[in-house]
């Protein structure tokens, strides 16, 4: 992890197959690194695991759904507060997780959902998204291929969408999500500099 953040316009931590609760040194290092990121005042975007790392750093738990649900597929989020402006043109996003975060104190909830109540929040100039707006059609296919190869029953988890329905929704929402991400980066994340 870089110790000098001055060359960066923004910092993004993406998702991954690991859990923020795993006892791996690199996860602990990323959680600790958040102190430097926040103090640098550089805009930050946490996506899925990245959002959970921010929440964990801010003192909140990241836990499995109490009804043992997963979100693997496309799900609607409900904008809250400032999220009404952020998500006014797009509120269905691709998700791939079995854990969710609590909203830390002094943070602003931006969106909530059904299975995982907290979907997005803001802390100072940091945005945390539980979902994956960065995943396009090819990345989506690659993820499904790699995950199904390792865990062939993952799409049978309660709450998950089947492969064909996910692909149908990918075709339906791919362009709108891509446009939303471009707008979000320009009008919210990078506008904070």
Q: What is the predicted function of each stretch?
A:
Residues 1-45:
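Flexible gly/pro-rich beta->alpha loop and the following alpha-helix that scaffold active-site loops
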Residues 27-31, 61-63, 111-112, 145-147:
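Glycine-rich, phosphate-binding/catalytic loops in enzymes
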Residues 16-17, 51, 98, 133:
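Active-site metal-binding loops of divalent metal-dependent hydrolases
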Residues 56-93:
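A conserved active-site-flanking secondary-structure segment within enzyme catalytic domains
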Residues 22-24, 55-57, 105, 138-140:
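Short glycine-/acidic-enriched loop or helix-start segments at secondary-structure transitions
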């Amino acid at each position: 992890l870089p110790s000098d953040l001055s060359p960066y316009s923004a910092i993004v931590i993406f998702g991954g197959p690991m859990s923020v609760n795993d006892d791996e040194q690199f996860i602990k290092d990323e959680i600790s690194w958040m102190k430097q990121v926040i103090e640098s005042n550089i805009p930050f975007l946490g996506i899925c695991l990245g959002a959970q790392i921010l929440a964990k750093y801010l003192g909140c738990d990241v836990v499995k759904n109490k009804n043992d649900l997963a979100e693997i597929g496309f799900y609607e989020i409900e904008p809250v507060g400032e999220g009404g402006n952020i998500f006014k043109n797009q509120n269905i996003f691709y998700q791939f997780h079995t854990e969710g975060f609590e909203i830390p104190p002094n943070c602003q909830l931006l969106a909530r959902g059904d299975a995982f109540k907290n979907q997005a929040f803001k802390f100072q100039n940091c945005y945390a998204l539980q979902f994956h707006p960065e995943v396009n059609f090819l990345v989506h296919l690659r993820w499904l291929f790699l995950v199904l190869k390792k865990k062939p029953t993952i799409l049978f988890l309660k709450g998950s969408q089947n492969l064909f329905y996910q692909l149908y929704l990918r075709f339906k929402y791919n362009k709108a999500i891509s446009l939303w991400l471009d707008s979000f980066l320009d009008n919210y994340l990078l506008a904070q500099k």
